[in-house]
A protein has these predicted regions:
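A generic structural signal for short beta-strands and their flanking turns/coil linkers
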Residues: 14-16, 27-29, 73-79, 90, ...
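N-proximal, solvent-exposed amphipathic alpha-helical segments enriched in charged/polar residues
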Residues: 1-11
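Catalytic strand-loop segment that frames the active site of acyl-thioester-processing enzymes
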Residues: 16-49
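Hydrophobic beta-strand-centered segment that forms part of the acyl-chain substrate-binding groove
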Residues: 63-93, 98
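HotDog/MaoC-like acyl-thioester-processing domains
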Residues: 87-89, 93-134
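Compact, glycine-rich, soluble single-domain proteins
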Residues: 45-59, 63
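Hydrophobic residues in beta-strands and at strand termini
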Residues: 33-35, 83, 131
């Protein structure tokens, strides 16, 4: 199993404030999004996170979940992100689970929730990956 905590964030993840938090034994991988002002898509009086920021979270968290389930190099080949409500510019919990990791393809589901007492679900997504090595 890959030690996900030892992997450095990509430059894009670092720019978005996306960091690895933990991997659970049940296959859930958790990341934290601390969005900078550059990740916003709206202005005052009601700023919100840009949809591209949330889609990047689906891609990255899905990759972490797939890599944990079956290490060996994966590349996203398909991505879907459903935006359920405006995402406030606050920290968010990004949780992913690998649904399937085969010899050549893998699929992960992702939930993005506000990281606060309400834990409102703001987006869900699914990412598919193709193995790039071996």
């Amino acid at each position: 199993m890959t030690d996900l905590s030892a992997l450095p964030p990509s430059p894009l993840d670092a720019a978005l404030g996306l960091t690895f938090v933990e991997a659970h034994d049940d296959g859930i991988v958790v990341l934290r999004l601390d969005p900078p002002e550059s990740a916003l898509g709206g202005d005052e009086p009601r700023p919100f996170l840009h949809g591209g920021t949330l889609a990047t979270c689906v891609d990255t968290a899905g990759w972490y979940a797939v890599e944990q389930a079956s290490p060996g190099g994966w590349l996203a080949i398909d991505l879907r992100c459903d935006f359920l409500r405006l995402a406030a510019p606050v920290p968010h919990r990004v949780a992913a689970r690998c649904l399937h990791a085969g010899r050549t393809l893998a699929t992960a589901d992702v939930e993005i929730r506000a990281w606060d007492e309400r834990e409102r679900l703001v987006a869900v997504g699914r990412a598919r990956f193709a193995r790039t090595a071996g």
